[in-house]
């Protein structure tokens, strides 16, 4: 069978891990990482400095990996932390208010890991350099930037080309990556180093900003102290795609 056809067929199948949660295969290959400073959407905004850490735009190669189709819910997280008490009505919502350490521990407990920052961006943007999961033009109401968190499968418009839900809005997500400069970046940022973990994706919190379009862009990078908990931040898990069905030896944190 033609290799490209095989890859295409593989993408339509869901993968189950130890927790039987649906995962999607993101194939190996290059994708567009980062943001072009000449991007049309930035030219109409006055606050451009927060996008400097996502430059320069470049082609970046990643090995194949799996990523959860949906964010981890309260119901799933309570299996890991049964002492946590959440209202029944929240069970189908993405868990939030968990620290990076708690998110990381959950993913390892379930036999997975947090996605690296670059993995998250590829799963969200695909290979065609789009700024939002639906394209390059901001569409208000397509993703959740409202007042309330919604179920992980609520918005059919907020689905990437790899069938990953909720990457543009609802809650931001922890990644495994430290906040570091991109390859070939000339930006000097005092926050670079192993102090903050990168979070990705828009959230209901971003509606309070006047530059919602910029903060909602998939290349946008945010960062937070790993020990902190935020009411608009959750997570999903990932797993390396191993050859011949061999189990992943463990995460390689960026």
Predicted stretch roles:
Residues 2-7:
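Sec-dependent signal peptide recognition
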Residues 15-16:
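C-terminal motif of bacterial Sec signal peptides marking the signal peptidase cleavage site
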Residues 19-86, 99, 169:
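A short glycine-rich, aromatic-capped structural motif
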Residues 22, 245-254:
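Sec-dependent signal peptide cleavage junction
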Residues 26, 32, 37-38, 86-222, ...:
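Functional-site microenvironments in short loops/helix caps that host divalent-cation chemistry
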Residues 230-247:
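Short, structured beta-strand segments at or near domain termini in extracellular proteins/domains
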């Amino acid at each position: 069978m033609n290799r490209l056809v095989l890859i295409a067929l593989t993408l339509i199948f869901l993968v189950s891990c130890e927790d039987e949660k649906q995962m999607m295969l993101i194939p190996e290959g290059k994708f567009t990482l980062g943001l072009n400073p000449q991007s049309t959407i930035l030219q109409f905004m006055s606050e451009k400095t927060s996008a400097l850490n996502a430059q320069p735009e470049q082609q970046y190669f990643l090995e194949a990996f799996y990523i959860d189709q949906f964010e981890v819910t309260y119901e799933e997280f309570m299996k890991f932390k049964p002492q946590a008490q959440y209202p029944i009505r929240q069970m189908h919502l993405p868990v939030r208010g968990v620290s990076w350490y708690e998110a990381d521990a959950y993913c390892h407990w379930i036999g997975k890991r947090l996605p690296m920052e670059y993995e998250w961006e590829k799963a969200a943007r695909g290979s065609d350099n789009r700024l939002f999961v639906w394209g390059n033009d901001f569409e208000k109401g397509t993703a959740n930037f409202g007042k309330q968190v919604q179920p992980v499968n609520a918005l059919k418009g907020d689905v990437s080309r790899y069938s990953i839900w909720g990457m543009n809005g609802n809650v931001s997500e922890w990644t495994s990556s430290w906040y570091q400069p991109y390859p070939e970046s000339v930006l000097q940022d005092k926050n670079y180093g192993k102090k903050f973990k990168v979070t990705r994706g828009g959230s209901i919190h971003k509606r309070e900003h006047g530059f919602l379009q910029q903060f909602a862009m998939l290349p946008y990078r945010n960062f937070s102290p790993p020990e902190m908990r935020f009411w608009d931040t959750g997570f999903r898990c990932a797993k390396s795609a191993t050859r011949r069905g061999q189990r992943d030896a463990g995460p390689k944190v960026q």
